[in-house]
C-alpha cells in the first residue's frame, strides 16, 4: 500500500502498514490480505469487513485493545486519521515546549490527567480509546443513539485498561449538544467532535457514491454501495454547518466549563460562516488547524473564551 504521508509526527501509523505483524497479532485479518495495483500487500478498503478486521488488528497491535467491535452498518472509522486529531489536540493543550533543532513540539501532555469530552462518541469509541492509551487522558463520550452508547460501554468494560477512564452519557435531546451533558460544576480541558457531514440520507448516499466512483475510476451504483454508518453518524438537519453553528452558540453558556472547544470541519466552504460566527461571539481566540493524510486535507476548528 502507498505510504500515508504527512500524518502527525507522533502518529503511530506513519509509513506503511506492517501486515506481517498485524496478521500475527490478529490472524483473522489474513483472509482479507490482497496484492494491490502496485504489487504491495494491502486489503480491499471498499470491503467493510476487511476494514473492520484491519481496525481490530491496529487496536491490538498499537494500543493494546484486545476487544473492539461495532454493530452492523455502524461507522467503521479509519484509525490513522482519527489518531491525527488526537495528536493535534495534544499539541493544542500542552505547554509550548519546542525542540530547538527542529522547532517542533516534543513534549507529550501526560504530566497531568487531562479531561476531554467527545461529542458524538459513536459505537466505535475511537477518540477516547486513542486519547486514553496514548496520553492517559480521561474522557466523557456523549451520543444521541442508545445503541452507540451501549456498544461503546461494552468496549470500555471489556478492556481493563479503559475501565474508570471513559464514561459514556446519553444525550436525550437531539437538538442539544452540551446541554444535558455538561454538569454545572464540571470542567473539561477540551471538547472534540466529528460532526455529521450531510443534511439528509440522500445527500450522504450521493456523496459516498461520488467518492467511491472517483476512487475506483468508474461509476458506482447504489446496488454496489456498501454504505457504512448509521443515520445520526452521517447526517443531521442542516448538515455540518448548522450543527457547528449550534455548537458555537451553545459553547457561550459553557465558557467556564471548557478550556478549548474543537471540531473537525469536513467542508472547507463552511469555514467562512463558522469563523464569522466566532468573530461575532466574545471568544478570546480561535484557530484553524490543518491535517494532511496523503492528498486529503482536513481541518480542526478550535476556539476558547
UniProtKB/Swiss-Prot annotation:
One of its GO terms (biological process) is rRNA base methylation. Pfam families: Methyltransf_10. One of its GO terms (molecular function) is 23S rRNA (adenine(1618)-N(6))-methyltransferase activity. Coiled coil: none annotated. Gene3D superfamilies: Vaccinia Virus protein VP39. Specifically methylates the adenine in position 1618 of 23S rRNA. NCBIfam families: PRK11727.1 (NF008725). It catalyses: adenosine(1618) in 23S rRNA + S-adenosyl-L-methionine = N(6)-methyladenosine(1618) in 23S rRNA + S-adenosyl-L-homocysteine + H(+). Transmembrane segments: none annotated. Signal peptide: none annotated. It comes from Bacteroides fragilis (strain YCH46). Keywords: Cytoplasm, Methyltransferase, rRNA processing, S-adenosyl-L-methionine, Transferase. Its EC number is 2.1.1.181. Belongs to the methyltransferase superfamily. METTL16/RlmF family. It is found in: Cytoplasm. GO terms for cellular component: cytoplasm. This is Ribosomal RNA large subunit methyltransferase F.
Amino acid at each position: 500500500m502507498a505510504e500515508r504521508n504527512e500524518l502527525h509526527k507522533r502518529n503511530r501509523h506513519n509509513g506503511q502498514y506492517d501486515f506481517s505483524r498485524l496478521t500475527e497479532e490478529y490472524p483473522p485479518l489474513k483472509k482479507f490480505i490482497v496484492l494491490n495495483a502496485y504489487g504491495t500487500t494491502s486489503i480491499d478498503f471498499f470491503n467493510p469487513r476487511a476494514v473492520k478486521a484491519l481496525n481490530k488488528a491496529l487496536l491490538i497491535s498499537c494500543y493494546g485493545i484486545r476487544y473492539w467491535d461495532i454493530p452492523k452498518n455502524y461507522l467503521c472509522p479509519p484509525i490513522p486519521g482519527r489518531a491525527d486529531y488526537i495528536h493535534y489536540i495534544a499539541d493544542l493543550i500542552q505547554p509550548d515546549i519546542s525542540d530547538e533543532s527542529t522547532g517542533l513540539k516534543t513534549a507529550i501532555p501526560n504530566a497531568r490527567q487531562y479531561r476531554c469530552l467527545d461529542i458524538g462518541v459513536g459505537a466505535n469509541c475511537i477518540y477516547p480509546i486513542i486519547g486514553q492509551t496514548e496520553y492517559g487522558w480521561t474522557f466523557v463520550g456523549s451520543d444521541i443513539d442508545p445503541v452507540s452508547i451501549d456498544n461503546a460501554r461494552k468496549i470500555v468494560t471489556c478492556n481493563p485498561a479503559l475501565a474508570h477512564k471513559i464514561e459514556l452519557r446519553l444525550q436525550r435531546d437531539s437538538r442539544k449538544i452540551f446541554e444535558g451533558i455538561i454538569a454545572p460544576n464540571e470542567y473539561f480541558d477540551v471538547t472534540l467532535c466529528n460532526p455529521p457531514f450531510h443534511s439528509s440520507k440522500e445527500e450522504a448516499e450521493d456523496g459516498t457514491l461520488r467518492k467511491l466512483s472517483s476512487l475506483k475510476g468508474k461509476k458506482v451504483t447504489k446496488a454496489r454501495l456498501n454504505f457504512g454508518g448509521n443515520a445520526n453518524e452521517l447526517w443531521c438537519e442542516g448538515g455540518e454547518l448548522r450543527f457547528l453553528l449550534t455548537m458555537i452558540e451553545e459553547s457561550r453558556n459553557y465558557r467556564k466549563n471548557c478550556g478549548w472547544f474543537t471540531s473537525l470541519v469536513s467542508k472547507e466552504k463552511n469555514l467562512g460562516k463558522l469563523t464569522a460566527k466566532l468573530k461575532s461571539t466574545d471568544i478570546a481566540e480561535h484557530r484553524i488547524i490543518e491535517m494532511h493524510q496523503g492528498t486529503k486535507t482536513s481541518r480542526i476548528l478550535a476556539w476558547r473564551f
